[in-house]
Amino acid sequence: RGLGDVYKRQGQVFDPFVYLGMLAAHTERIALGVASIVLPLRHPAHVAKAAASADVLSGGRLILGVASGDRPEEYPALKLPFNERGARFRASFEYIRRMWEEAPAFENLHGSPYGGMDMLPKPVSGKLPLLITGGSQQDPDWIARNGEGWITYPRGIEAQARIIRDWRARIEAAGGPEKPAVQSLYVDLHDDPDAAPRPIHLGFRLGLNPLRSYLESLQDIGINHVALNLRFNQADIGSTLQRLAEEILPEFAGG
C-alpha cells in the first residue's frame, strides 16, 4: 500500500541523499524513502546528519531504509572488511539513533560523542523510522525488536505469508507495537489490462487487473507497502505511472 510514496534504491547514479533533497524540493505530500542506505559503507554521523536534513527539508516525510550491503566488491574500495559488515551495521544503527538525542554521549565502534556538542538539525518528529532491509546479517529477533519496520523481498504468496507471520510473532513476543512490512516488486506493465503474469527478475510482466489482484493478496497476508520498481518496464514510464496512479493508487493508497 502507499503506492504514492517514492522510494530510491541506493545504487542509483545519484547519491541518495542529494536525490532526496531534489525530490523534497519538487514534491509536497508524498513520503520519501530510500531502500536502502548501506550503513557499513558510510560513517553513521554523516548518515544521521544527512537523513535529518532531508527530513527537515521535506517537512518530515523521510523514511530511512538501512541495510548491511550485499556487494563484496564495494568494501575493498573503502578498505573495509566485508565479513564484519554485520557488526558494523549494528553499531551504525545504534549510533544513528543516539545522535538524534539532545547532546548525545555514548561509546560506539564508530566513535564516542562526549555530550559537549550536538548534531543539528534533528528530525522533525525527534527521530526517523529506520526500516531494516532483509536480514542485514542480524538475528531475526534483533530485527523484530529494533526496526520500526521491515523491508523484505518478493516471494510466493504462501512463503511470504509464513515469513511475515513469523516476523510479527517475534515482534509480539518482544512486546513491541505493530510495525509495517514492506516488499519490493519489479513490474513490467502490459498494455493489455488482463495480460496474465509472466515472471521477470523479482517480479512480473502483467496487466493492470492481475497486478491489482496480486497486490490484494499481499495486503491479505500482512504486507503494508509495496515499492514498485519499473526498471524493466518496456512501456513509456510516464504513461505507466499515469495508469498506476489512475487504476491502482485509489484502491490502495492511504489504507
Language model region names:
Residues 1-255:
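Active-site-adjacent structural elements that line small-molecule/cofactor binding pockets in enzymes
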